[in-house]
Amino acid sequence: MAKKQILLNAFNMNCVGHINHGLWTHPRDRSTDYRLLPYWTNLARTLERGLFDGLFLADIVGVYDVYQHNVDVTLRESIQLPVNDPTLLVPAMAAVTENLGFGVTVNLTYEQPYLLARRFSTLDHLTQGRIGWNIVTGYLDSAARAMGLNEQLPHDERYERADEYLEILYKLWEGSWEQGAVLRDKVGRVYADPAQVHQVKHAGRYYHVEGYHLAEPSPQRTPVLFQAGSSGRGQRFAARHAECVFISPPNRAVGRETVRTLREQLVQAGRRPDDVKVFVGA
């Protein structure tokens, strides 16, 4: 029997400390340099030398403001605030590496699918096929308020919207441009064949999109899809869409049961039990 191959992802966030709250005060800690590009390019080079498979970048939209009904502690301790956009780091890190992959968290609840499709196609081009998307739907009421809502959408409704969102993205990434659409014919003055570029028309419960995908086909077209939801609805979503799932169980027994349930959900979704790679937080 062939040996299983372990895959290693580093886990970070475009902020001070990430989940190691308070460690930024240690004399040897350099995470306050997160604002500077060399901090990230040096990290990328180090991970590549260490034969890591990828760098997983977390993100949040919103702030932690529940404790004492304010953000005072969040700001004093720098608990994922301030936090910068993770997607903008990727091209710089890709430029100094050859094999390192990048999984970037983007909350789809507050992004229009048409624009997000272009952003990830652009990242896929610039990384030459090394980009992944960690799909999240959000969990902070502060984010909902910042985006013009009174509170978060109900949990399961967020995943219903996410299913439709992915349906649109697949149409844009996989269906708008045929494989032979890009000719780059300088003599004939034809960059792309109009007959092979198609308008996407989607009219659903939550989204209406009518347009051509703005980016030409990228190396992967659809990025590697990560998901980290542990609820029943989140696992059903992962079973339908994900290629990689991130879990952080409190012990082995819980982790084993989480993976077993996920494998069952994959079969129910018409996929093979081993179609998804599971990454465990450590």
Regions found by a protein language model. Name each.
Residues 1-96, 220-223:
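N-terminal beta1-alpha1-beta2 module of alpha/beta enzyme domains
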Residues 25-37, 74-81, 101-113, 152-158, ...:
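The substrate-binding groove and active-site-proximal loops of carbohydrate-active enzymes
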